[in-house]
């Protein structure tokens, strides 16, 4: 579940949506994305600790700097201070989740904050990063790194090597999880994939290169996923490209074939 604010179209906020989903979720891993510079750390620590206490399985906080002047201005934050606000927030979050009393006089100002409940087990922190300095921050501060969906396979290989080298310089082994998101459509036939690709190319897609999008039949999608696994990525998170719900559901159903091909 993502984190967007002051959007032009309806966007249902991540914390209440995830709280509802957890009623049906079971014990599988679960999590959400939070843009740390936009959130008051005590409020966010409480929200995530509550979700983690409800969840039956591991809770993952994906996090990043965020972008877009509109949402920073609307929430009273200075976009120029994103890196320092991110690092300060993450440090405070981890302290509060351990049950510590925390004060801050940096980008955020609060005194003697404690939260309850505290998470029943440690929160996994996956840091989304694309620029070299951000990938190095993810290597230093995160339990895992989440590569952005705008990368082509070749760019994903370069970014992976940047992350690996940063971990080596820090004297750290590679984590169990190195994830990447792909925006995809799994078609029934190659000609359907060509049609979807033409439609997306005509309208543009978030400024991404078309080579960064995963569009194809199950064999084609499995081939790209296999290339990412061979680079060293352990987890692929998908977002559906097609705007039509029926096509999206059909694409998700075809992912079962992709999974079989990767065994």
Tell me the role of every PLM-derived stretch.
Residues 1-263:
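Active-site-adjacent structural elements that line small-molecule/cofactor binding pockets in enzymes
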């Amino acid at each position: 579940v993502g984190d967007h604010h002051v959007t032009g179209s309806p966007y249902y906020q991540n914390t209440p949506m995830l709280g509802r989903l957890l009623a049906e979720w079971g014990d599988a891993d679960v999590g959400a994305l939070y843009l740390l510079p936009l959130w008051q750390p005590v409020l966010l620590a409480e929200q995530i600790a509550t979700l983690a206490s409800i969840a039956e399985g591991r809770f993952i906080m994906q996090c990043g700097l965020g972008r877009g002047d509109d949402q920073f201005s609307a929430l009273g934050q200075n976009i120029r201070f994103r890196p320092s606000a991110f690092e300060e927030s993450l440090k405070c979050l981890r302290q509060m989740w351990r049950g510590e009393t925390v004060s801050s006089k940096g980008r955020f100002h609060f005194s003697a904050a404690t939260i309850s409940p505290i998470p029943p087990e440690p929160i996994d922190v996956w840091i989304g990063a694309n620029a070299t300095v951000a990938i190095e921050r993810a290597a230093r501060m995160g339990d895992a790194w989440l590569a952005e969906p705008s990368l082509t396979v070749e760019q994903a290989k370069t970014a992976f090597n940047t992350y690996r080298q940063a971990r080596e310089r820090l004297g750290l082994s590679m984590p169990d999880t190195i994830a990447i998101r792909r925006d995809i459509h799994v078609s029934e036939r190659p000609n359907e994939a060509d049609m979807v690709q033409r439609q997306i190319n005509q309208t543009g897609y978030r400024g991404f290169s078309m080579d960064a999008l995963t569009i194809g039949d199950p064999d084609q999608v499995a081939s790209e996923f296999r290339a990412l696994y061979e680079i060293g990525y352990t987890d692929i998170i998908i977002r559906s490209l097609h705007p039509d719900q029926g096509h999206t559901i059909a694409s998700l159903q075809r992912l079962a074939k992709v999974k079989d091909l990767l065994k």
